[in-house]
Amino acid sequence: MIDTSDVEYFPTAIVGAGCAGLTLAHELINSKDFPCILLDPQKFRPEHAFSFWDDGHPHLTLARSLARKTWSKWEIRTFEETIQKSSSRFVYSTVSSSNYENYLFKKITENRGKILNARATDLYNTETCIRLETSSRNAVFANRVFDSRPPTPTNKTIFQHFLGWEITTNKSVFDETLVTLMDFRVPQEDGFHFMYVLPYSETCALIESTVYSDTVFKPKWYENQITKYLMNVIQCKSWDVINKEQGAIPLNYKKDLKPLGAPIGLNAGAMRTSTGYAFSQIIHQAI
């Protein structure tokens, strides 16, 4: 990322350079509200799979072009039954978070947008613009400010929490044409628990242990669940873990006392709390 050492004025400032902040900045490139500056103390972000339902809408054109894999068939499984569906209109797609965000970052900086590796600490309205104080001691001046920081969970929130392994196998064990959205053939004692399977090929897939509960577990818990699922349900005896991802999404949260600009992203209701999906809604907000 790029640091700015001098105080500068920007038509737009965005607090946070994650998915929501970068998506909005990219959408502003050809508008009068660009160039913009994004403020974020985090230099690197862990890899995640951004998955979404693609109905062919134009606002998903970029995401569609960057999709790692798409599926037109999906299923939900329990011990008692399997429900499979397919559609030519709705396609399930997944995008690598690093590929998506790196693409946006490149386009933003090529067009004179900037990233400041600093935390926004306060906001003041002046007679002519907005002044953002930062942890780098450099103030940022902008005409408009957007705040993409995630919301603060309440004390009694429910989380959708998960840990996933991307694995490779030496034998064909996955149907690469079929996404398993929820497989409930796993223990249910610790919460609403299912496995989520994105098969990238017959020998490569993301296997994610996902739970809805008020307690986030230690990594070993999910890893044990994935191991048992692979061995007992998938009937896979050996594999290599080539990537991991982990997260905890609060499904209810409180209003922050002082937003640093107009909220976007999760703080602006981009996530569907019943499912945890947010990617396509974040893009729709930006447009």
Model-derived segments and spans:
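An active-site-proximal "capping" alpha-helix that borders the catalytic cofactor pocket
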Residues: 224-230, 278-287
